Amino acid sequence: MITKTYSVGDLKKYKYVVVLSYCNGKILLSRHNDRSTWETQGGHIEENETPLEAAKRELFEESGAIEYSIAPVCDYWSVTEDMSHGSNGMVFKALINKLGKISESEMAEVRHFDALPDNLTYPAITPVLFNYLVQMNDEV
């Protein structure tokens, strides 16, 4: 899989949002009920929803975040090596001050990490996006 980052607004139309979340100075990842792997918060942008609205909704649904600051970081585009399947979206960074309960219908748990774990749901996308933050000197 190939993943590339772009300046915010370069791609114009977005299908997904990805939220790179930090809580207490650590990376906050979620684990879906149907998987044993870890992932950032994010998902589809609904019809008539802005990327920011989608990011806030997904952040709450998948982490339980109730007090936070959030801002766009970059756009991303990802495609399989054979170019048959791809996705694009806007990436946000969230600094979470307070977590509430997560929706148990979708997520099994959230966990704090010092660094990205090996067992990521999207191993060809997630490290690229976090590395972008490091390159921009914008990590926590």
Where are these regions (language model features)?
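Acidic, metal-coordinating catalytic segment for phosphate/diphosphate chemistry
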Residues: M1-V18
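Active-site beta-strand termini and strand-to-loop segments that position acidic
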Residues: S21-N24, A94-I96
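Conserved Nudix-box catalytic region and its N-terminal flanking loop in Nudix hydrolases
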Residues: Y22-E61
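Unchanged
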Residues: I45-S69, Y76-L129
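Divalent-metal (Mg2+/Mn2+/Ca2+)-assisted nucleotide/phosphate chemistry catalytic cores
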Residues: M136
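Short acidic DE-rich linear segments
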Residues: E139-V140
